[in-house]
Each structure stands twice: as C-alpha cells, then as structure tokens.
Amino acid sequence: MGKEEKTHINLVVIGHVDSGKSTTTGHLIYKCGGIDNRTIEKFEKEAEELGKKSFKYAWVLDKLKAERERGITIDIALWKFETPKYHVTVIDAPGHRDFIKNMITGTSQADCAILIIAAGTGEFEAGISKDGQTREHALLAFTLGVKQLIVAINKMDSTNWSEPRFNEIVKEVSNFIKKVGYNPKAVPFVPISGFEGDNMIQPSTNAPWYKGWNKETASGKHSGKTLLDAIDAIDPPTRPTEKPLRLPLQDVYKISGIGTVPVGRVETGVIKPGMVVTFAPSNVTTEVKSVEMHHQQLTQGNPGDNVGFNVKNVSVKEVRRGNVAGDSKNDPPKGCDSFNAQVIVLNHPGQVGAGYAPVLDCHTAHIACKFSELLEKIDRRTGKSVENNPKFIKSGDAAIVKMVPSKPMCVEAFTDYPPLGRFAVRDMRQTVAVGVIKSVEKSEKTGGKVTKAAQKAAKK
C-alpha cells in the first residue's frame, strides 16, 4: 500500500464472559499492534512474578482494562492493530461496566462485531442459552446498526480441533444469528485458539480438515483462513460525508482572545470555515470562523473528526453540551416536541408503563424523557406488532413508545442520522433499555437568534 493512508475501521468484540474475549483481543493487539515490546516485557515479568504463566495475552488486556477502569487514560494506541488493508481500533469489549451505554452513545459506531464463541463442552451451550449475554450483545449490535459480523469459534484446542464439534457449533450459531437478524452467508466462521494463538494470524496446522471460511456480501465473495484474514475482508465502511451536517457538542469553551469554541465530533456531513450553522434546540444561528483539530487549522472537518470551531457573537450561555450544530441552509437541526422509538427493555426489575420518566443518553445529550404512550408491543425479531396499547412492558419486551423530553432536545430518526437516532435509557445507575428512533415531531420554532456574523455571511 506504500505510504497511502489505510482506512480506519472500528471493531467491537462481543460474547459470553468466559469465551476468551480478552485473550483473543489481546493476542491480535500483541501480534499486530500498538503494544511496544518494552511494555510487553514489563507485563511478562510482572506476570511471571505473580505466577501467571497463562499471562500471554489476557494479562495485557487486564492491565489495560484495570487502568481504564481506574480512570487512567491509557494510550489509546494500545487498542489498535493493523491488517494489510485497515487500521483497526477495538472500541470496546463488553464486561466493561458501561459497554452497552458506550455502544449506543458511543464515541464511534462499530463497523463490525466479532462474536467470540467458546467451543468447550458445556461452555458453548452456556454462552448461547436463552438468558445468555451472547444473545443480548448480538441483538444490540444488530439493532444499533452494526451491519457486519465475524464469528470466531475459540478454544478449539480444548476440543482437539474436532471437525464434528466445529460443524455442530457453526450450525447452531448460524440459526442463532439468523434469529437476531444477520445473514449467516455473509458471516465468516473462523476456528481459533486465542490462547495458543492458533489460526489467528497464521493458518493453523492442527486442522487439516479446515479448508477456510467463505462469505458473500454486496461487495462479492470472499474467502480466507485466519481471523486476521476475516477482519481484513470487512467491507469498507462508507462515511456519511454527503449528508447534511450534524455535530453534537461535547463541550463549549470560552477562550480569551478567541471567543466561544464549541467542541464535538462530526457525525455526518462536513463543517468548514465560512459556513453558517444553526444550533438546536437553542435555535441560535451564526458563522463558523475557523475549524481546528489537534491544534491544526482545517479547511474542513469530516465525519469522525473531533473538532473545535470558533463562532462569533455567541456566548457560552447560549449553546451547551447536548446541542447539535448543523448547516443552516441544508436541513438544519431542530428541537423536538416528541418522538416515537422502538425501545427494548434489557434489565428493569419491575414493569414499565406510561408515565415512566428515566434519563436518556442520546449522542451527547443527557435528558429525562417521559414514556408518554406505549403504542404497541412488537416481536423483537420481526418488528411485527403483537399487541396494541399494552399497559406495561417488562424485561425482554420490545415496544414502540411515544417519548416526550422534559426539556428541549435535538434527536433524529435512526434511518436519517444513525448516531442521533439511538439512545440508552438509564435508571438505577444502569442501562435499563435501549432505543432506536423511528420518527420525530420537530418543534417549528421561529424567531431564533441570528447573529450579525450570520447576516453578513448570508450577504456574501
């Protein structure tokens, strides 16, 4: 590839607690990635002192996780690795307390999920049982728009690389992911041993029967042997540059000598100096004077970029975290009076009825919203209605709900602007439900503030 920039992709790793996620992820990062030898040697030494011979890779990840949990920001390079085609970032692995919330409000949308399944006797069955986390994670990934999936069948060494066991698991898992919504034909099934590092990067020599994986997607047929091959064969993501701008604000700074600087991640569209932007729901319109990222001036900010931009005649009191910036001339963002969403209740101890008012985390907004009407209960898999106007919904149920925010907020339909159309419902310090927004009733407010800078720019 020479010096050309490789495409960046984001991976999320899902699967049951003991499926070997850490070991497998650790191995990829260890072998293809961002962990330098010095760090590895340090970890290896510590592992030996603790008698953790099994260290190999999980230890690396445990160290990173522990540091992350304690709020030590670790060098994010540690969560990166490379394939021939891609720069890969592992954006999260479950088990992390806020996994579900991260996956929804997530700083980034995953392009692909790797589902890790343990092949050991009894282990596989436990992971995929009715109440299994595996089902929940796979369903979440699918519901939240992670379109591509890779299945890694791990711990094959514990089955002596048994072909019948592999085939049995492939058959079961195919049925399982089909129920969730994925097409098994588009999914590579890769036998591996994360612990031994077998068939991860180099083809295994332990499975003469294994001819490799195949998948067929919109981009054609692909085949390969190893897990790394499967990651390299992910269909390249399309970044939503063509859509109108949506930029949820993470913070707003006041910088002396410069003025007001909102900061956030461009989710769709582009932002450039000279553009006249509208903030919703605060309904303020002004001109963008400059855009920068990592202290460098940009001619434009693209989807995925975390940018700061300087705006004139707007005080820090007028725009805040949770507001959304958009192009005033191209489908500008608006506040909403209410919205309808498909809500899936994950773990709520009681019943949820009309009037329930938990906090919603949607992009960077964190606002209490009332479940004002339960419109219909639906089958999670097919999306078909099974009951109109149910009185209550409980854990495991999915429903279309009319939601009313307690104060102005800006959201969008998931089909129009995915990152602004999915949310986590938080209550009792945990994620009790997730939702995907179907339609939005926008506030048709007129007479918002239009700054002098915006009026001038309009005349140009």
Swiss-Prot record:
N6,N6,N6-trimethyllysine PTM positions: 80
Binding site for GTP: 15-22, 92-96, 154-157
Residue numbers spanned by region G4: 154-157
N,N,N-trimethylglycine PTM sites in chain numbering: 2
Start and end residues of each tr-type G domain: 6-241
Region listing for G1, in residue ranges: 15-22
Record carries keyword Nucleotide-binding: yes
Modified residues annotated as N6-methyllysine in this record: 3, 31, 317, 391
Source organism superkingdom: Eukaryota
Region described as G2: spans on this chain: 71-75
Region of interest: G5: 193-195
Residues modified as N6,N6-dimethyllysine: 3, 317
Pfam hit, one: GTP_EFTU_D2
Start and end residues of each stretch annotated as G3: 92-95
Subcellular localization, as worded in the UniProt entry: Cytoplasm
Annotated Gene Ontology cellular component terms: cytoplasm
Keywords: Cytoplasm, Elongation factor, GTP-binding, Methylation, Nucleotide-binding, Protein biosynthesis
One of the record's GO molecular function terms: translation elongation factor activity
Main location: cytoplasm
Gene3D superfamilies on file: P-loop containing nucleotide triphosphate hydrolases, Translation factors
Family membership noted in the UniProt record: Belongs to the TRAFAC class translation factor GTPase superfamily. Classic translation factor GTPase family. EF-Tu/EF-1A subfamily.
PANTHER family given in the database record: TRANSLATION FACTOR
General function of this protein: This protein promotes the GTP-dependent binding of aminoacyl-tRNA to the A-site of ribosomes during protein biosynthesis.
Protein name, per record: Elongation factor 1-alpha
Organism: Coccidioides immitis (strain RS)
Gene that this polypeptide is encoded by: TEF
